């Protein structure tokens, strides 16, 4: 990006050097100029739907950041510690929903299937862990969260307790 005078004469490079497709500022420039710079058919982030069962929809963008679309259609980046939350090899965001009057995000360990619930502001900024620490697959509250978020977190094919016929 170049900074120009009112007479459209070059003054200097704008920003901090080259804008790359793996940087959030690249996609901000696409939105600011309303142009698809990388030819992916989308202006701004290309979003993949992660979960869309309730009033809140969870998306992951093409540089691994997470976003929530609220019931009014507004898209919010999920922020923790002033940084955009990104996926990693161990932890993945699985769902976002309003439960019991709180906006919550479910952050799951991909190996153990245990998870934390994050309490968020209405702008989807992390405030604190919700509840009493990590939710484990041997706890009733784990299965309540499956029902609250309408997702099968442990991969058993059932939302909530898996019941066995004993008769």
Positions of predicted regions on the chain:
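Long, low-complexity, Gly/Thr
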Residues: 1-167
